[in-house]
Amino acid sequence: KMVKFMLRGALHRVELERLWRVVGAPTLAPLRAADPGIVEKPLRPYLHARASLSERVTLLRQHYAFLRGRHAGLLARLFTPQGILLGSYPASEGESIRIVLRHDVTFRREGELSISLLNEAGQRLYSCAFNITERAGVRALVIGSLQGPEPAVVEPMALIQQLTKRGFGLRPKSLMVMLAFMLA
């Protein structure tokens, strides 16, 4: 694996150096600690299948340049498993469901940030992974995935129905998209 990375790195040195100029910044040290493979991301399919290596580097550079420029004070918290608490979701008595914004390494190809509904055990009940980028000079939020409960969650279909009831008819999937739009 290391040999492949070194060969690819040598072959695409200029592009990887472009990426490192952004993610190598001291303010992004928490990112590198949480996701040491960040530099490898453009070497594989990322965000959409047709993106070239140069486009993948640009997507990552734009995302992290935006975060560094606008939200540098939040970076350390974004790259922790706890992330930033955005709110809570209606839950049954004695239960807590958190809405969290964070960098989740599970979404290696789908996006650099995610909004997730998490139960008390920290299991993802629903997630939306995305990147912040620019298109024709206009900032855009690109959603890479919307995912339901992770495999460890018991009875996922029943859970989604319960979450929809608790949310007064608002489906978790719709909530994730609405929250992403609010962040944009």
Language model regions located:
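Terminal substrate-recognition subdomain of acyl/acetyltransferases
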Residues: 1-112, 119-126, 134-139, 148, ...
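Acyl-donor binding region in acyl/amide transferases
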Residues: 127, 133-184
